[in-house]
Regions:
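SAM-dependent Rossmann-like transferase core, predominantly class I methyltransferases
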Residues: 1-71, 75-87, 103, 216
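Intrinsically disordered, low-complexity terminal tails and inter-domain linkers enriched
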Residues: 41-48, 113-115, 224-225
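S-adenosylmethionine
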Residues: 72-74, 78-224
Length: 226
């Protein structure tokens, strides 16, 4: 339906969507909620301007939800696709939201290297579908861009793994990483993060349907290990 109306509800927002951008799904609202709760906690603890980075932002759904629900936060969104970035820019402008949009590879130091080691929260809904999987939802299969769907590699985890590496550089010690994945990838993505040896408190959280959907990890401090 969103592809017909050009509008997609997301938490309290109504986003403009169209050709070339992934339409956000309900499970991603939960991911945004985790980031919002974490940013809110930081504000309550006295952090003046929590720094949140949304990698692979697409329509800017997560970034906008955070910026509008935690106005004290500084939110930076990164998107590689020119088409998706145009939709993100349109949504940010229409809502007059305080979100900085950066165009480029979310896994590249050249795009966000100035933020290394100072970010409080990194959140991402990257492409993660395995190459041989066909999306069950026909709207996804027929309308959403392949670039936003398929995570590359034999298991679809090549891009999520690269995002996790980038997040480990961006986050300050003790910073929080949140990332969506396919329900069949729960154990695999946890193993990936444990193998990177940059994370502690690595665990997976289920979506509202009880399926593994979001990996959560804390950037290790010096001397900590997973």
């Amino acid at each position: 339906m969103q592809h017909i109306t050009g509008l997609a509800p997301f938490r309290h927002l109504e986003l403009c969507v169209g050709p070339g951008v992934f339409v956000p799904r309900p499970e991603t609202e939960m991911l945004a909620g985790l980031a919002i709760d974490a940013a809110t906690t930081l504000v309550q603890e006295g952090v003046h301007e929590p720094l949140v980075v949304d990698l692979c932002t697409g329509s800017a759904a997560i970034a906008l939800a955070i910026a509008t629900e935690v106005p004290q936060a500084r939110v930076i969104a990164v998107e590689l696709s020119c088409d998706a970035a145009q939709w993100a820019e349109c949504n940010i402008t229409s809502m007059a939201a305080q979100v900085e949009l950066r165009r480029g590879d979310a896994t590249a130091e050249a795009v966000t290297g100035d933020l290394d080691g100072i970010v409080d929260i990194v959140v991402s809904n990257p492409p993660y579908i395995p190459p041989d999987a066909i999306p069950i939802d026909p709207e996804v299969a027929e309308h959403d861009p392949a670039m936003a769907l398929y995570g590359l590699g034999d298991d679809g985890l090549a891009i999520p793994t690269a995002v996790a590496w980038r997040a480990s550089d961006l986050l300050r010690p003790g910073g929080l990483f949140l990332m969506e994945h396919a329900d069949v990838q729960g154990k695999a993505i946890v193993d990936v993060l444990l193998g990177q040896q940059s994370w502690v408190k690595v665990h997976d959280q289920n979506d509202d349907a009880g399926r593994p959907r979001h990996v959560v990890a804390t950037r290790a401090t010096s001397g900590e290990s997973s």
